């Protein structure tokens, strides 16, 4: 079951329910829970900040059975995702592994989900935008 790690956390931690091998590349990792998100709410799956900066914690997969797996950090990232209102199925967390395959131990917190209220504006096609003259984007105002 997802939990807040501290009382004022914005979201709930998502746990891997059992030992899971993470292969190189993108992979959907089942979390073992189903959700029913009500109308007007969405869930935003986010990486945990510690994994984002330090790498994802897991165990090496030894080439030989007599070698013991070693705990280390791997270059793997959680890809952000949205759980739409009305969704009624199991949550998966997408991991992009840029490293060697590794095993995440069952019970490891790998991501978090934050729920938000949302509104959908009515979109209209137009040839002219009125209001602020604000263009550019992507850093057009500089850094200082």
PLM features: what roles do these ranges have?
Residues 1-144:
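DUTPase catalytic domain/fold
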